[in-house]
Amino acid sequence: MKPFSLLLCFMSFLGCKAADFRSVDADTFEQVIEDTTVIRLDVRTASEYAQGHIPNALLIDVTQADFMQKAEQLLPMDKTIALYCRSGRRSKTAAQLLAKQGYQVIELNTGFNSWKGEVEK
C-alpha cells in the first residue's frame, strides 16, 4: 500500500505547475517595453496611477476583486504583458495570476520606485 500511496502523491504533483513569469530589473524592463507589441500594465491603484505612470500603460488594480475579469477583457493572450506596481510586491501577485491563466508575463521586480525612464501624468 505504501508504494501505491507514494505513487499517487507523486502523480498529483505532476499536475501542479507553478505560474511562470520573468522578474527583471528596471533597465531590462525598459528594453522589454521598447517593443511596441508588448502591453504595459500598471497594477497599482487609480490614485497611484494618476500621480505618474509609464507612458501608454493600462491600469488594472490588482487589489480589486475583478482584476482577472478586467485582465481577460483587456489583455490579449498572444501578447507579452510587462507589468509593474509601486515596489514589486503587488506586481508579483498579478504576474502569478496572469501567468497561471497562460499569459506571457514580465514583471518589474523593484517596481515603479526604481523606474528612471519617462513618466506620464
For the regions a language model picked out, list residue spans one by one.
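Rhodanese-like catalytic fold shared by cysteine-dependent sulfurtransferases
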Residues: 2-3, 15-32, 38, 47-80, ...
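Bacterial N-terminal signal peptides
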Residues: 5-13
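Intrinsically disordered, low-complexity boundary segments flanking structured domains
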Residues: 10-11, 45-47
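Structural scaffold elements adjacent to functional motifs in cytosolic proteins
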Residues: 40-42
